[in-house]
Amino acid sequence: VANTAILGYDLNKVYEGRGPLEAASIEYDMQPDDLALRCNIIELEDDCIKNHHGGHLTTEEGNMLIQSLNDKLGNEQIKFITGIQYRHLLVIKGGNKHITCAPPHDHPNEEWKSLLVQPEEGYHMKDDHRMSPQATANLLNELIIKSQTLLANHPFNLHRKAKANSIWPWSGGYRPSMSTLMQLYPEIKSGSVISAVDLIRGIGHYAGLDVIKVNGATGLADTNYEGKVKAAIEALEKQDFVYLHIEASDEAGHDGDLDLKLKTIENLDTRVVKTLYETISNWQEPVCIALL
């Protein structure tokens, strides 16, 4: 929501949830009847959400688990699609977006059964070709429960301390309709987005920005700060606009690690902002930096 609003979009007109934006980032071609949801792989312990990331899975590990789930639970209506790390995609053909899902990072140490998907209160069916909100919620909850059995018995989890033992679908929507930044702001002729996160890349895709991927950009505290700022400077030499996104402090905050969050903010200041400012200060053409 915040990243879309920062770029100047009217959220009431364009926002469809994280799922459709992340689908664009991984080049999944959403169809008009698709419901796309973010699908976290999370860790449950003692019937509670222990964390929202399954012990910080790598993309390779996440892909292995998602492909296994798709083999066992996927069909013509249901697709599990690999994203990045613990962040993946669940597509339901004919699914209804008028449901209430709990973001797992907002509910650590809470009982998962109390957070299951619910139909949106007060919504009256208008799309006869789609499932009802209740049927959609029932299907998603069934997938959550089935995933727990499959993941608990997956060889990957049998000898791993942190258990990636449940899916958690949320933030679903339909294919969005967004103008490009160039259409919103004629002064911008070209631009790029730099991020390790599918959500931000997806926003950039719909905004008409080039998506720049940086080696070593992890979205965590160990990300390649220098590589990202170097890519931003190189893009600014050729283009009018660069959206540089650093995820590390957000992940540290969700983990409740104050020391790490402070360190990531220091890294942002000394390894990104300082380098960027010192470089562009020597340019003849003025550059505006907005730090948000």
Question: Which residues make up each language-model segment?
Answer:
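Anion-binding catalytic surfaces of enzymes that hydrolyze or transfer phosphate/sulfate esters
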Residues: 174-260
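Short, hydrophobic/amphipathic alpha-helical packing segments
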Residues: 62, 66, 137-148, 225-230, ...
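Glycine-rich, mobile lid/loop segments that gate access to catalytic sites or pores
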Residues: 49-174
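Active-site His/acidic residue clusters
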Residues: 46-48, 92-123, 233, 237-277
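Beta-sheet entry/capping signal
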Residues: 89, 240-241, 286-289
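Metal-dependent active-site segment of extracytoplasmic phospho-/sulfohydrolases and closely related
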Residues: 1, 264-292
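Active-site nucleophile/metal-coordination loop of metallo-enzymes that catalyze phosphate/sulfate
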Residues: 1-77, 91
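Generic, well-ordered alpha-helical scaffold segments in large soluble proteins
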Residues: 146, 150-154, 202, 206, ...
